[in-house]
Amino acid sequence: MASSNLIKQLQERGLVAQVTDEEALAERLAQGPIALYCGFDPTADSLHLGHLVPLLCLKRFQQAGHKPVALVGGATGLIGDPSFKAAERKLNTEETVQEWVDKIRKQVAPFLDFDCGENSAIAANNYDWFGNMNVLTFLRDIGKHFSVNQMINKEAVKQRLNREDQGISFTEFSYNLLQGYDFACLNKQYGVVLQIGGSDQWGNITSGIDLTRRLHQNQVFGLTVPLITKADGTKFGKTEGGAVWLDPKKTSPYKFYQFWINTADADVYRFLKFFTFMSIEEINTLEEEDKNSGKAPRAQYVLAEQVTRLVHGEEGLQAAKRITECLFSGSLSALSEADFEQLAQDGVPMVEMEKGADLMQALVDSELQPSRGQARKTIASNAITINGEKQSDPEYFFKEEDRLFGRFTLLRRGKKNYCLICWK
């Protein structure tokens, strides 16, 4: 992405919700590289899909020659952002937050280049400037510049202030000051002139712009990316099992890949613009080809491949594709022990069983059948496979060779109903 028209390019991709003084920002970008930042609060032990758009935006700016600062909120994570939250957040312990800070910093690192000369990325932590700040300094040097009248009129906290059952504590109310000071601090330390974030961060970003102007007399800017929505109105980034995480231990690469494969046709081309680095021309060409092919669209596979590679690397992508192919074909010979571990984690339903069980019992325990009687009929009708091999004997007992890697047996009823037995 060429820097001079970067904002226009982001707008073409649908990646800009709001921007302060767009003309002045475009002018500033045209003058040469800038430093910009995005903050990530450690509110869990992993980032999730909702963090991916702003994180990839940092990467887009770096590719255009700008210097990204990834700020992990070691201090703000101890407080909790009330923006558009219906209730007060639970406060986490310092040890927990510190542990999460380390994990999130490691997660952010692969997306940015920390060794590319002038525009190498920087990892920062706001605990560095808040950790030893005393309350009087905070109130005199920061609080003095904030008008409570303006703060209570910010959309992000308005709804909480108007609810009788859920007010807002002074702790969460002060979050706005902390994030505002982050911007002023990064402006002074690294010359940061732009903050990017989700659209729910607009109120916090504009506070930082005002504070930076008051403290350092510098003009700085804010840009928010939109909240990702799905065409059917359901929430993006959630599955029946909850959030889709970037940590492979919380959402396996296979499950992650499948999430993207299942994208609706109405969303897929928009998501290619949000989550990949394909050019608009390439995406439009793909859409045209899909429309004219008369076959199932290729776009979902392209999207799944691109995003899985971005988040889990080539190895994670190949494992996800291998598992997908083996489940589709029914032949399991290509699967490694690690592949089976992904399936056990969240890929297919899983049941633990003691050795010595028979097939009928396994079908009932795995909920592939409601009763032994029904299981008997289904086995006899040749509708059950064990590790891809048909089994039609209702009296069948599992043998040692059925336990792949000594641990796993994959049952299938019909074409699509799987359950993985993990032997105790």
Curated annotation (Swiss-Prot):
Its main location: cytoplasm. It is found in: Cytoplasm. A motif ('HIGH' region) lies at residues 42-51. L-tyrosine binds at residues 37, 175, 179. It comes from Escherichia coli O8 (strain IAI1). A motif ('KMSKS' region) lies at residues 235-239. It catalyses: tRNA(Tyr) + L-tyrosine + ATP = L-tyrosyl-tRNA(Tyr) + AMP + diphosphate + H(+). The keyword Transmembrane does not apply. It holds the Pfam family SYY_C-terminal. Catalyzes the attachment of tyrosine to tRNA(Tyr) in a two-step reaction: tyrosine is first activated by ATP to form Tyr-AMP and then transferred to the acceptor end of tRNA(Tyr). Belongs to the class-I aminoacyl-tRNA synthetase family. TyrS type 1 subfamily. Keywords: Acetylation, Aminoacyl-tRNA synthetase, ATP-binding, Cytoplasm, Ligase, Nucleotide-binding, Protein biosynthesis, RNA-binding. Residues 357-414 form the S4 RNA-binding domain. It comes from the Bacteria. The keyword Aminoacyl-tRNA synthetase applies. One of its GO terms (biological process) is tyrosyl-tRNA aminoacylation. This is Tyrosine--tRNA ligase. The gene is tyrS. Its EC number is 6.1.1.1. The modification N6-acetyllysine is found at residue 144. GO terms for molecular function: ATP binding; RNA binding; tyrosine-tRNA ligase activity. Homodimer. CDD domains: S4, TyrRS_core.
